[in-house]
């Protein structure tokens, strides 16, 4: 990846403590010994992943720290599905279907199998990529004309959805079983998958008689309505871990709220950041750590949530260069590494009528350097 900017952040079991020294193109050694004074802390190393022109857009990472997304790499600004690792720090392009001018990787497992979508002359379609087989087109549901893959598990099974005259429909693809439609809740006319775990449990959203609902499809083929938070009318599940814990958002008269759903406790609200008006949970790892975004008075801020600490603003621990703020955290792996998106703080940029164009988004990798 291009110009690397690294900073150290601290989180205690309570409030974030602040910035550790250093902004450089290389790792700096300045370290303030806060841990002894303030108790157990989590330290993060923050690495800027993007080049500053918006050409690189990381989306997911596996438990080995390999990152997938898309990158404009053909000299014409055409986005291509890409992965980054220690051997390919500048990115390895996966290509696309014949004639494609767009492809994007949206999931990777720990064996390096990657899934995503690429367009053709007629439509966008899902793919699987392997080191041996390269990029291969996946089928969609009968009668559908386009589709997108969203996640892949350790077995190489893929959660996806396709669309046609009957609307969007979630499905699960496997090498042994091919395409299997996941169905909808009673009265629903569409469904979308967003994530799956190693037990082939799929999290997503389905229409229903009561409106859009967060749904969990279990391996037995049943679709389970996860409900909403009290008083709300719609919900959507965005991620699931290997314990079957699901996160997403519920929406009603009081706005959008991040939720965690577990088999034992059902759906519980995760709250909002101080002064905020809404929140949404975007990812969860196998330890139950949740990341996402919460709207505040100064715009969206990325958060991390743990049961022992509650919701913490990632920006309380660091002031990133040039007025940049972390606006959402959208992926987290077993090691606690977090992918976050950055943008310009309102206080760090010119008014709208003084700017020629909005600043391109930035992406960051937050790597814990000690156990929480």
State each model region's role.
Residues 14, 18-19, 25-372:
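Residue-level hotspots at or immediately adjacent to binding/recognition sites across diverse folds
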């Amino acid at each position: 990846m291009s110009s690397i900017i690294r900073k150290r952040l601290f989180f205690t079991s309570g409030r974030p403590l602040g910035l550790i020294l250093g902004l450089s193109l290389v790792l700096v050694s300045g370290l303030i010994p806060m841990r002894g004074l303030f108790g157990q802390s989590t330290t993060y190393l923050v690495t800027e992943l993007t080049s500053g022109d918006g050409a690189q857009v990381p989306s997911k990472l596996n438990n080995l720290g390999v990152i997938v997304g898309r990158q404009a790499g053909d000299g014409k600004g055409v986005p291509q599905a890409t992965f980054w690792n220690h051997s390919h720090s500048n990115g390895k392009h996966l290509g696309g279907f014949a004639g494609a001018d767009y492809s994007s990787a949206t999931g990777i497992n720990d064996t390096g199998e990657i899934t995503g979508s690429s367009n053709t002359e007629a439509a966008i379609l899902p793919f699987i990529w392997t080191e041996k087989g390269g990029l291969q087109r996946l089928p969609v549901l009968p009668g559908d004309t386009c589709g997108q893959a969203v996640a892949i598990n350790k077995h190489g099974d893929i959660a996806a959805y396709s669309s046609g005259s009957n609307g969007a429909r979630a499905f699960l693809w496997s090498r042994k079983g091919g395409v299997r439609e996941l169905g909808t809740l009673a009265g629903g006319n569409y469904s979308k998958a967003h994530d799956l775990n190693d037990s082939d449990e799929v999290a997503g959203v389905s229409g229903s008689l009561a409106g859009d609902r967060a749904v969990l499809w279990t391996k037995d083929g049943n679709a389970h309505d996860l409900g909403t938070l009290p008083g709300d009318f719609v919900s959507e599940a965005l991620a699931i871990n290997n314990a079957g814990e699901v996160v997403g958002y519920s929406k009603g008269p009081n706005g959008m709220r991040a939720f965690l759903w577990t088999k034992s406790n059902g759906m519980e609200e995760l709250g909002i950041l101080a002064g905020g008006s809404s929140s949404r949970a975007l990812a969860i790892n196998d330890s139950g750590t949740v990341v996402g975004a919460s709207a505040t008075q100064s715009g969206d801020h990325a958060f991390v949530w743990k049961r022992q600490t509650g919701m913490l603003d990632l920006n309380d621990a660091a002031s990133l260069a040039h007025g940049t703020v972390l606006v959402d955290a959208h992926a987290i792996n077993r090691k606690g590494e977090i992918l976050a998106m950055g943008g310009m703080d309102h206080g760090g940029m010119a008014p709208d009528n003084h700017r020629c164009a909005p600043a391109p988004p930035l992406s960051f990798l937050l790597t814990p350097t000690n156990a929480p």
